[in-house]
From Swiss-Prot:
Pfam families tied to this protein: DUF4659
Coiled coil feature spans: 360-624
Highest taxon above the source species: Eukaryota
Region (Disordered): 1-63, 179-262, 268-287, 364-386, 398-425, 448-580, 651-706
Record field: compositional bias (Acidic residues): 1-11
Protein name per the record: Coiled-coil domain-containing protein 177
Chain intervals with Basic and acidic residues compositional bias: 368-386, 448-529, 548-580, 651-663, 676-706
The species this protein was found in: Mus musculus
Post-translational modification Phosphoserine, affected residues: 310
TM helices/strands, residue ranges: none
Keyword line: Coiled coil, Phosphoprotein
Composition bias, Pro residues: 210-221
InterPro entries: DUF4659
Ranges annotated as biased composition (Low complexity): 28-49, 179-209, 242-257, 664-674
Length: 706
């Protein structure tokens, strides 16, 4: 739940900017978005410390930012955090959830597809009912946590605006009493939430706290500036009291939890009452001084530059440089290589401390993961048992429905068989009477037409009545279904089953009505079709005879027209041939005239082109002679200049080679000294394998050859 800053706090309650419990981001309680994956949590944790820096920088020069304060952007640099399905949230929201005994993950919305995927045997209607029940429960919990969070915000504002002096003592006493009551009342919620895997940022925050009693020391209740001081002097005093002579600075394990402890000590002590939230009580299996003991409550992480500039690191580097000078007899080591050696030593110290912290945190995380696995297994077993019960009930209902449907189908098949037998009997009778009824075809056709019209009108009337009845029944079923759905949201699973039975009964009645209407319609259509076919057969025979006579007349008329068109086409073709021959003769005469004119023009063009070619050749010969003389003169000048430049380059190259040899000797000496210093640092910080020793021997041999 995101913790927005109220208008009163923006105006004067906390002048340091937005509060520190915006240090982490999460799914808001009043937002209905989907659950964030671990990658979004990681990005939120990377962006959250930047929010935590805002109060220090928003003072406008009243308080100087400490250059020793650094943020830890590697809260999720572990394999366990990659698959985490939990999100970070603000301290107010966490405290509200703890007071209401609600896990933060229960406030996240779940998609309907997740419920269907978890129980593949359930029908979509059952999954929808479960989803609605889950959403109603989630919204109720969300409203409860939201109200509790508003109550916490009012308590904080009341505590912030409490006047200093004697009147502040009762307020501080009541605040401590409420904090102790909160810690006692939320012990069950702490125990329940401890079974869940904690988010990586909160895990790192708990890892940095040395002991639970150290976190329960709040500053004076009336001094807000004491809780928010981040000056250089206070940070220096904290660092001097926290760091020993062996470790020049603590590792980069910043967490927003320590910043929250400085600003909200009552809530920090309430959270400390949960025994599963501290990792400092875990034993150190390696037998080395634990990194958790090096970071007290008010300590801050320091950069690699702070570690490299510590006096112990500088003395260590000086000792290595003196040792290399004494052993190798080389010149002094440059300042840059001294800094590199100091950084190597500082990085080794930082990695060692970070490994110890991660080992302790991983042990705590593994315990919480095992507890979460056990809880998930129990829930899965309960879910499977409920699923098996639902599956058995569903199988019994399906079997009962299948038997009922089989009986209905057998009854319908028997009725269809009887109807088919009756229709077959009528067809045989009609076939026997067909010879007798052929003479009365005209009268029967008229009578059949009248009967068919009457039957069609009756069919239309019955069909419209059936449709109206179906619509009324469907509307009735829809209203009943809406009423049952409204009642089902108020009642439980029993009423859902009754609704299903009523729905299936209504559907069965509608299905039977549709079947009866369809059978009656098919019967009527079959009788009407038979009578219409007999009438259309007689009309078709008469039409066929008329068509035969008409087709013979059309064929005779078409033959006469085609003969007339053939004579006309032959005359037109002869006339067109004569015109074409005359046109070809005219074209031949015009082509001869054009050829004579073109030959004359081509002869004149050839003579003119020959004259131009002779003149162009003479001009090119004169230009070639002039260019040849100019090229010879330029070549002589270039040759003389090239000889002079070669002489100057030879002199310059000899001078540069002498300077290069002297600089190379100096650089090799410095490189040997730097190399030996770094090797000394590596020998003290790293373990040497056989392959590393072989490579070092080869490198020494190549340096000695140089």
């Amino acid at each position: 739940m995101v913790d927005p800053v109220p208008e009163e706090e923006k105006e004067g309650a906390e002048p340091g900017g937005s509060e520190g419990d915006e240090a982490t981001a999460s799914e808001p309680p009043d937002a209905q978005g989907a659950q964030q994956p671990a990658a979004s949590s990681a990005s939120a944790s990377a962006a959250a410390p930047r929010k935590a820096e805002v109060p220090c920088g928003a003072e406008g020069g009243r308080r100087e930012q400490s250059p020793l304060l650094h943020l830890d952007l590697f809260n999720f640099a572990c394999p366990e955090a990659e698959g985490s399905r939990y999100v970070l949230t603000s301290p107010r929201s966490l405290e509200a959830c703890a007071r209401c005994a609600v896990k933060p993950v229960e406030l996240l919305p779940r998609a309907l597809a997740d419920l269907v995927r978890e129980a593949p045997g359930r029908s979509m209607r059952v999954a929808t009912g479960l989803y609605e029940a889950y959403e109603a429960e989630r919204l109720a919990k969300l409203q409860q946590c939201r109200a509790e969070r508003e109550r916490i915000m009012r308590e904080e504002k009341r505590r912030l605006f409490t006047p200093k002096g004697p009147a502040a003592a009762p307020a501080s006493a009541s605040a401590s009493a409420s904090a102790s009551a909160l810690s006692g009342g939320s012990s069950s919620s702490c125990s329940s939430s401890s079974s869940l895997p904690a988010s990586p940022a909160s895990r790192v925050a708990r890892r940095t706290s040395p002991s639970p009693p150290a976190r329960s020391r709040p500053p004076p209740a009336g001094s807000r500036t004491g809780r928010k001081s981040h000056s250089l002097d206070s940070l220096s005093r904290r660092r001097d009291g926290a760091l020993s002579s062996e470790s020049g600075a603590s590792s980069s394990s910043y967490s927003g939890e320590s910043l929250r402890e400085l600003r909200w000590p009552p809530r920090a002590s309430a959270r400390n009452s949960c025994p599963a939230g501290s990792a400092s009580s875990a034993p150190n299996p390696l037998g080395r001084p634990s990194a958790l003991a090096l970071v007290p409550l008010t300590a801050r992480s320091f950069s690699l530059g702070d570690l490299s500039h510590s006096p112990q690191t500088a003395q260590h580097v000086e000792r290595i440089v003196r040792q290399v000078r004494a052993e190798r007899g080389l010149r002094g080591v440059p300042e840059r290589d001294r800094k590199i050696a100091a950084l190597m030593l500082a990085r080794h110290q930082e990695e060692r401390l970070l490994l110890e912290q991660r080992a302790a945190a991983h042990g705590q995380w593994e315990q919480q993961r095992v507890r979460a696995e056990q809880r998930r297994e129990r829930e899965e077993r309960e879910k499977q048992r409920a699923l098996e019960r639902g599956r058995r009930a569903w199988a019994a209902q399906v079997e009962e429905r299948r038997g009922r449907r089989g009986r209905e189908e057998r009854e319908a098949a028997r009725r269809r068989q009887q109807q088919c037998e009756r229709s077959e009997e009528r067809r045989r009778e009609l076939a026997e009477r067909q010879g007798l009824l052929r003479r009365e075809r005209v009268e029967r056709a008229a009578r059949d037409d009248r009967l068919r019209k009457l039957q069609q009108e009756q069919n239309l009337k019955q069909r419209e009545e059936g449709r109206q009845e179906g619509r009324e029944r469907a509307e009735l079923v829809r209203r009943e279904r809406a009423q049952r759905a409204a009642r089902a949201r108020e009642r439980q699973e029993g009423q859902l089953q009754r609704e299903k039975r009523e729905l299936s009964r209504a559907e069965r009645a509608r299905h039977e009505a549709l079947l009866r209407g369809r059978v009656r319609q098919q019967q009527e259509e079959r009788e009407g079709l038979r009578s219409s076919l007999e009438a259309s057969l007689g009309r078709a025979q008469e039409n066929y005879e008329q068509l035969q006579e008409q087709r013979a007349r059309e064929l005779r008329e078409r033959a006469r027209r085609e003969e007339l068109q053939g004579r006309r086409a032959k005359e037109a073709a002869e006339r067109k041939e004569r015109e074409h021959q005359a046109h070809l003769e005219a074209l031949a005469r015009a082509g001869e005239r054009r050829l004579q004119h073109a030959a004359q023009v081509a002869e004149e063009a050839v003579q003119q082109k020959a004259r131009r070619v002779v003149q162009t050749r003479l001009e090119k010969e004169r230009a070639q002679r002039a260019n040849k003389e100019k090229v010879e003169r330029d070549e002589d000048c270039r040759r003389r200049e090239l000889l002079q430049a070669i002489g100057r380059k030879l002199e310059r190259s000899e001078q540069l080679s002498r300077e290069r040899r002297s600089a190379l000797e100096s650089a090799r000496s410095t490189a040997r000294a730097s190399f030996h210093v770094r090797e000394k640092v590596r020998e003290e910080t790293n373990t040497r394998s056989f392959d590393r020793m072989v490579r070092e021997a080869q490198l020494h041999a190549s340096l000695d050859r140089k």
